[in-house]
From Swiss-Prot:
Summary of subunit composition and partner proteins: Forms a complex with SecF. Part of the essential Sec protein translocation apparatus which comprises SecA, SecYEG and auxiliary proteins SecDF-YajC and YidC.
Keyword terms, alphabetized: Cell inner membrane, Cell membrane, Membrane, Protein transport, Translocation, Transmembrane, Transmembrane helix, Transport
A molecular function (GO) term: protein-transporting ATPase activity
GO biological process: intracellular protein transmembrane transport; protein targeting; protein transport by the Sec complex
Subcellular location: Cell inner membrane
Family named by the database record: Belongs to the SecD/SecF family. SecD subfamily.
UniProt function note: Part of the Sec protein translocase complex. Interacts with the SecYEG preprotein conducting channel. SecDF uses the proton motive force (PMF) to complete protein translocation after the ATP-dependent function of SecA.
Domain of life: Bacteria
UniProt protein name: Protein translocase subunit SecD
Major subcellular site: membrane
A Pfam family hit: SecD_1st
Spans through the membrane: 9-29, 361-381, 384-404, 406-426, 452-474, 486-506
Length: 518
């Protein structure tokens, strides 16, 4: 009589108890602080929600970078007294002319000092400046990565929505927000760059002339809305005296007239700059601009050294909260364009879950009937192992908070068949040994040993495919790969460990004369 391996018994009990504890939140409310509380995280197609594919407008970012670089070059050329003319930004490059060939060498030295990765193409007295290919790729990756983080902060400022954000291709971002019933809100907060800047108002400019297109050099015309919803224009200095990147907090509030405002505070550097601006420009107006639209242009009555203030405007409570959220999250490095939009209602997700349950239940019952009909008691053991495999899958999905999608349910159903396939392979090998006239114990041991290598090879091959699907796939394909991987691991454990243990217990304590396979 063989001895049962104690490590198998111990391992099986521990894994099963642990799986029950992890899977419990899917069936009932767990109040104990010592037990897991997370149920399976349902994907967009099961829970409903919003699906957006965003395009990062890298060309706009690059053009703005070139404009900033052009301003830096002008400043350095003036300081070093280098003569130039016709310095313009065109097609993501800077073009200029030097007045004499002798000025090319010091000009190149300045350019290399500012940014060594700028490529200078010289044609007689004309120079074209552009970024190298490697620098462009680095900038693109940086902009997309920053955009993903800022989108995450805007969409999930409270940390409860669990959005899915993935980079697709070179400059696309996939955003999925399960349970989001208001996609227009998402589009609104993502459609704004939220670049907050402070400018001094050009008090000497003629508004009427500026509206006609005659804007003074170094200034620009911005439009705002008055409390009566009438448009008005203000000419402001192009120079940004303070940026929104120095903000630390922003929140909706009310002024003394019970009007909605946005209260803000700067960091130490921002507070110092803000204090100097208000101290040196008392009596002048300071324009607060968001995405080139004027929010307000209050008159500076005196030095503000506390580093805080309010933004007034034609705000509702909702719009003030929205602006505060955008300012807290930070400005996007580049505008985002929505190139694909899908909205899935909760009822459709519920229908998908119900369909998945029916398909899984029908498949499970069909497999159980087939196994009992084909292999008798051993088929029953395979069904028990299959049930435990499903429990392990549910527990692992809950434990790791892997997102379960409709293709993921298909992956689980697929692993049900694979789990039983492993048992079928083992039982057929046992049957072959029994035909040779060997004992039950020898047939069982040899059947498991000879089938193990085949089962391992086939499952490893499938795991490699699942791994590749996860690496190169997106969205639902990743969900399928995750469910398939968890299913394969669970089914292998149940087929090789659980089934073998159940058969060993049956053979040892019930001593059957026949295994029911011949």
């Amino acid at each position: 009589m063989q001895n049962l391996p104690k490590w198998k018994i111990f391992l099986s009990i521990i894994c099963t108890v642990f799986a029950v504890i992890c899977a419990l939140p899917n069936f009932m409310q767990v109040n104990s602080k010592f037990l897991p509380h997370d149920s399976v995280n349902l994907g967009l197609d099961l829970r409903g929600g919003a699906h957006l594919l965003l395009d990062v407008d890298f060309d706009t970012y690059l053009n703005d970078s070139m404009e900033n670089l052009a301003d830096t070059l002008r400043k350095n050329f003036r300081e070093d007294k280098i003569g130039y003319k016709n310095l313009l930004v065109r097609q993501n490059s800077i073009q200029l002319e030097v007045r004499s060939p002798e000025e090319l060498k010091p000009l190149k030295k300045i350019i290399n000092k500012i940014d060594p990765e700028i490529i200078a193409e010289v044609n007689e007295n004309k120079i074209k400046l552009s970024y190298s290919e490697s620098r462009l790729n680095d900038l693109l990756n940086k902009v997309v990565d920053q955009s993903i983080e800022i989108v995450r902060m805007r969409v999930d400022s409270t940390g409860t929505k669990e959005p899915t954000l993935q980079k697709q291709g070179d400059k696309h971002i996939l955003l999925q927000v399960p349970g989001e019933e208001n996609p227009s809100y998402l589009k609104n907060i993502l459609g704004k760059t939220a670049k907050l800047t402070f400018h001094l108002v050009d008090e000497n400019a003629n508004i009427e002339e500026a509206v006609k297109g005659h804007v003074p050099v170094g200034s620009m015309l911005v439009k705002g809305d008055s409390e009566s919803h009438r448009e008005y224009y203000v000419v402001i200095k192009k120079k940004v005296v303070l940026g929104g990147d120095q903000l630390t907090t922003a929140s909706a509030s009310f002024d003394q007239n019970s009007q909605a405002v946005v209260a803000f505070s700067f960091n130490n550097l921002g507070s110092k700059i803000f204090g100097e601006i208000t101290k040196n420009n008392t009596g002048k107006r300071l324009a607060i601009v968001l995405d080139n639209k004027l929010l307000s242009a209050p008159t500076i009555n005196g030095a503000i050294m506390g580093g805080s203030g309010i933004i007034t405007g034609n705000f509702t409570v909702e719009s003030a909260n929205e602006l505060a959220l955008l300012l807290r999250a930070g400005s996007l490095p580049a505008p985002l364009k929505i190139i694909e939009e899908r909205s899935i209602g909760p009822s459709l997700g519920a229908d998908s879950i119900e369909s998945g349950k029916k398909a899984g239940l029908i498949g499970f019952i069909a497999v159980c009937i087939f196994m009992v009909w084909s292999y008798g008691v051993l088929g029953l053991f395979a069904n028990i192992a299959l049930s435990l495999a499903l429990l392990y899958i549910l527990a692992l999905l809950s434990l790791f908070q892997a997102t379960l999608t409709l293709p993921g349910i298909a992956g689980i159903i697929l692993t049900m068949g694979m789990a039983v396939d492993a048992n079928v392979l083992i039982y057929e090998r046992i049957k072959e040994e029994l035909h040779k006239g060997v004992s039950n114990l020898y047939a069982i041991r040899t059947g498991f040993e000879s089938a193990f290598a085949t089962i391992l090879d086939s499952n490893l091959t499938t795991l490699i495919v699942a791994f590749l699907l996860y690496i190169f796939g997106v969205g639902a394909i990743k969900g399928f790969a995750v469910a398939l991987t968890i299913g394969i691991i669970s089914s292998m454990f149940s087929a090789i460990i659980i089934t073998k243990l159940l058969i060993d217990i049956w053979v040892k304590y019930f001593i059957p004369k026949k295994l029911g396979l011949v």
